[in-house]
């Protein structure tokens, strides 16, 4: 059975890739250049795909940045720091991004005659990202089933899980988290201050494991959250 995984190069989608491959699917991946300020995540996505020996398609839709302004796409907008629950984090929402990604990924899945399409929405994204919520996932499932003669089933198996739960799954699967990138900034090291860094650091702290990537700031990995 064939499956396509939408792969950003971050923790969640990388864990999902390992998970899907471990289930025995003939696995393909798709990533997107959507005009984001940096594409460092995709560099790591490529490395992971090479490691796992899975095909990796990168689709350039850079024009999307002009249609969907966000702190992740506009050089004049600063990336906010703090927690996802902070109101300022709404600046990082790229309008309708996942609907666009999933629509294109569905076309790719159909071309491959794949039966499944996976993406890594999870519970930690719900407060700020509308297109990661369970209601959105269910609506997209129905739409994808109606869009073509070939049946492609959308799966978001982590939609009710917290990031630390996904991390536990990944560690059991042997995910190499040094080959993942979460930071909204594209520096040599992760900033440790933006929303995704904050959430990532908390996940590792909660399960008592040190993150293998480097940060610009010193992190107390023994601190409990």
Curated annotation (Swiss-Prot):
Protein name per UniProt: 7-cyano-7-deazaguanine synthase
SUPFAM superfamilies: Adenine nucleotide alpha hydrolases-like
Reactions listed under catalytic activity: 7-carboxy-7-deazaguanine + NH4(+) + ATP = 7-cyano-7-deazaguanine + ADP + phosphate + H2O + H(+)
Top-rank lineage group of the source organism: Bacteria
Requisite cofactors: Zn(2+)
Cofactor: binding comment: Binds 1 zinc ion per subunit.
Organism: Caldicellulosiruptor saccharolyticus (strain ATCC 43494 / DSM 8903 / Tp8T 6331)
One annotated GO molecular function: ligase activity, forming carbon-nitrogen bonds
Binding site for Zn(2+): 183, 191, 194, 197
């Amino acid at each position: 059975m064939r499956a396509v995984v939408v792969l950003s190069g971050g923790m969640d989608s990388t864990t999902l890739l390992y998970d899907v491959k471990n289930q025995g699917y003939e696995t393909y991946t798709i990533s997107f250049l959507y005009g984001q300020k940096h594409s460092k995540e995709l560099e790591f996505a490529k490395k992971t795909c090479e490691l796992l020996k899975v095909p990796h398609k990168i689709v350039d839709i850079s024009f999307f940045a002009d249609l969907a302004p966000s702190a992740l796409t506009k050089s004049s907008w600063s990336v906010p720091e703090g927690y996802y629950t902070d109101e300022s984090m709404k600046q990082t929402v790229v309008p309708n991004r996942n609907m666009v990604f999933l629509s294109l990924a569905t076309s790719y899945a159909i071309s491959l005659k794949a039966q499944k399409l996976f993406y890594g929405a999870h519970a930690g994204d719900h407060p700020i990202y509308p297109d990661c919520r369970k209601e959105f996932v269910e609506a997209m499932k129905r739409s994808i089933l109606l869009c073509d003669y070939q049946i492609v089933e959308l799966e978001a198996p982590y939609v009710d899980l917290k990031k630390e739960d996904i991390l536990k799954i990944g560690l059991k699967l042997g995910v190499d988290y040094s080959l993942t990138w979460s930071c909204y900034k594209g520096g040599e090291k992760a900033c440790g201050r933006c929303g995704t860094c904050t959430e990532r650091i908390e996940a590792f702290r909660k399960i008592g494991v040190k993150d293998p990537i480097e940060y610009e700031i010193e992190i107390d990995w023994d601190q409990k959250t």
